[in-house]
Amino acid sequence: MQLNPAEISDLIKAKIENLSVNAEVRTRGTVISVTDGIVRIHGLSDAMQGEMLEFPGNTFGLAMNLERDSVGAVVLGEHEHIKEGDTVTCTGRILEVPVGRELVGRVVDALGRPIDGKGPINTTLTAPIEKIAPGVIARKSVDQPMQTGLKAIDSMVPVGRGQRELIIGDRQTGKTAVALDAIVNQKGTGVICIYVAIGQKASSIANVVRKLEEHGAMEHTIVVAATASEAAALQYIAPYSGCTMGEFFRDRGEDALIVYDDLSKQAVAYRQISLLLRRPPGREAYPGDVFYLHSRLLERAARVNEHEVEKLTNGEVKGKTGSLTALPIIETQAGDVSAFVPTNVISITDGQIFLETDLFNAGIRPAINAGISVSRVGGAAQTKVIKKLGGGIRLALAQYRELAAFSQFASDLDEATRKQLEHGEVVTELMKQKQFSTLNTAEMALTLWAINNGSYSDVPVAKALAFESEFLSFVRTQHPEVLEAVNASGAMSDESEKTLEAAMKSFKSSYAYQA
């Protein structure tokens, strides 16, 4: 083999000419102090607000306070190994989390790392946890229903796709149960759900995951968990991480539902961080920007129009709108909704579902107070048949409550008042629903239709739920075409009503329901 010196020299010349030496400039600083997961660093002159900082031992932190001679940062995870004098490096990147379809069916921590023991998540896509919410022009009005499968909610406080509906109540009133029912009810609808657990016991989160698996809901759900034992910084960023994962689907013309359980604990974690960073405390010792903490998160839940989706997907998806629906949960203390955080979130959201301890203890579950629960935009998104049939439900309950208060003092009641009270009792009874026993549009319409046409007037209150269940089974077996037609069209035709009237007559003649 002959070596050609000219060729070798040409090769070496070409290598030298094509050699690229990219020098990366990264600012370094020194740890001055470490206290409760808060690190003060000197020498990071060009750190950005919210930038990721790298500590020794492959630990990362978040720059939060940019002062004249130092930077205050929170450590995302364990901080025990960080000591005074350690070197800290700027990464030049804002905190990002993995996004994509690969996350569906998995349980991840606040940084998107898997914690379910099912191996790594193979996604190459990441997105920043802090994003600007869609602008006014990019949005579209809410006009599609997000069915929860709960009679009391879908008939009285309907939720639309792209809406923010607050679930508020004391501890142990069934807030999480309502949210989980909404997640389970999305099975087969193509809606991707994200459940963000903030500051909860690890055992409670494991129980939620088990329940979702049992009902086949993990197939369309991502669980983001920041347990009570984790650093306050992780509890603070968990909702933003979950929101970013949901926005991935929204921006591709799909529908997503996100549950924040609960934002009270996130506010407490943020208060802890702020006080340790020596930011001035305000009302209830919360920092001045606690309203902005929740508003910038909840404003990201929206319905975006076709042009925005087309722009975000570079023309790949055309003619589709995307939505991210938020169900934030707030825990009140002794029913005090006038506290700082509850009033903030009530003013940010598009309505609220109030759950009451007294109703819960009386066996009315979901324990929804129909009088003060509202949906400010959901009416436009309600299914036609539910809107038509459910209109009288709220009125019946409101009148019943008013009359029930007066009837305690009156000894003899006239016939009309007595009938109204009996009707109200039956409606209250029929609004009860067991957990994970959600109904589809047609089944719900069937119950509302029976209430409206007086079919329950001769049914004892104690047997109302059993009567409802048996009648549903009867129609499912004898007249499935009626249910299919209502589900397909979202309306009840005159023909369907006639069929149901005949079915009710036939059912009543064969079913022993009288006391």
Swiss-Prot record:
Q: How does it sit in the membrane?
A: Peripheral membrane protein
Entry GO CC: plasma membrane; proton-transporting ATP synthase complex
Query: What's the EC number here?
Result: 7.1.2.2
SS bonds (residue pairs): none
Give the principal location in a single coarse category.
membrane
Q: Which InterPro entries match?
A: ATP_synth_asu-like_sf (IPR023366), ATP_synth_asu_C (IPR000793), ATP_synth_asu_C_sf (IPR038376), ATP_synth_F1_a_nt-bd_dom (IPR033732), ATP_synth_F1_asu (IPR005294), ATPase_a/bsu_AS (IPR020003), ATPase_F1/V1/A1_a/bsu_N (IPR004100), ATPase_F1/V1/A1_a/bsu_N_sf (IPR036121)
Catalytic class of the enzyme: translocase
State where ATP binds: G169, D170, R171, Q172, T173, G174, K175, T176
Q: Where is this site: Required for activity?
A: S373
Record keywords: ATP synthesis, ATP-binding, Cell inner membrane, Cell membrane, CF(1), Hydrogen ion transport, Ion transport, Membrane, Nucleotide-binding, Translocase, Transport
A molecular function (GO) held by this record is:
proton-transporting ATP synthase activity, rotational mechanism
Q: Where in the cell is it found?
A: Cell inner membrane
Reactions the enzyme catalyzes: ATP + H2O + 4 H(+)(in) = ADP + phosphate + 5 H(+)(out)
One Pfam family hit: ATP-synt_ab
Q: Which SUPFAM superfamilies match?
A: C-terminal domain of alpha and beta subunits of F1 ATP synthase, N-terminal domain of alpha and beta subunits of F1 ATP synthase, P-loop containing nucleoside triphosphate hydrolases
What role is this protein assigned? Produces ATP from ADP in the presence of a proton gradient across the membrane. The alpha chain is a regulatory subunit.
Give the record's subunit note: F-type ATPases have 2 components, CF(1) - the catalytic core - and CF(0) - the membrane proton channel. CF(1) has five subunits: alpha(3), beta(3), gamma(1), delta(1), epsilon(1). CF(0) has three main subunits: a(1), b(2) and c(9-12). The alpha and beta chains form an alternating ring which encloses part of the gamma chain. CF(1) is attached to CF(0) by a central stalk formed by the gamma and epsilon chains, while a peripheral stalk is formed by the delta and b chains.
Family to which the UniProt record says this protein belongs: Belongs to the ATPase alpha/beta chains family.
Annotated protein name in UniProt: ATP synthase subunit alpha
